[in-house]
Design a protein with these regions (language model features):
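Non-catalytic alpha/beta scaffold blocks inside enzyme catalytic domains
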Residues: 2-28, 51-167
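Short connector loops at secondary-structure junctions
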Residues: 29-56
Length: 167
């Protein structure tokens, strides 16, 4: 996980594992990953639920085609096969699109500073500015998200619905 990108991260995992083992000597205990996925698991689950296939699928032939290598965003961009880039990141303002010489549409966190963007649409954040649903990191449970504050920004769902209606 990218959350464990630091020196000796494996020692932290080993310590947690040893703690769970020690606790299990007298009681019951388990360790669950809680690292943030920034919605990756939810997107993958939604794609699988709606199309029968996870992300890295294409729909150019009116039916889903799944190929995790050829249809990865990195591969398509690297090979110059993308006409434009739609970048969506409502949770992390530091997750910005790669610097590519193609048109970029960014739908993102209001504090995102995406350089060289053709279109930027700020959105509110699920679980903070509006309700929503996300999948837990183990992809087995969907969790309802509440609202902590009011926002004048549209939600990602509202923006995507408006784009779809305009097409």
């Amino acid at each position: 996980s990218s959350d464990l990108n630091f020196d000796h991260a494996e020692l932290s995992i080993q310590n947690i594992t040893e703690l769970v083992i020690a606790l299990n000597a007298k009681t019951r205990s388990s360790g669950l990953p809680l690292g943030g996925s920034e919605g990756d698991y939810s997107v993958n689950q939604t794609s699988t639920w709606t199309s029968g296939y996870p992300v890295r699928s294409r729909f150019a032939r009116k039916h889903p085609e799944y190929d995790p290598h050829h249809f990865s965003a990195e591969q398509l961009l690297k090979n110059g096969e993308a006409d434009a880039l739609l970048w969506v990141s409502e949770f992390n303002p530091d997750k910005t699109p790669p610097n590519m010489n193609i048109p970029k549409i960014v739908i993102g966190h209001t504090n995102m500073h995406a350089n060289d963007t053709d279109v930027f649409i700020p959105v509110s954040t699920a679980g903070i500015d509006h309700t929503g649903t996300m999948f837990r990191i183990d992809s087995s449970v969907s969790l309802p998200l509440g609202t902590l504050r009011e926002s004048s920004l549209p939600s990602l769902v509202e923006v995507m619905t408006a784009i779809e209606a305009a097409l």
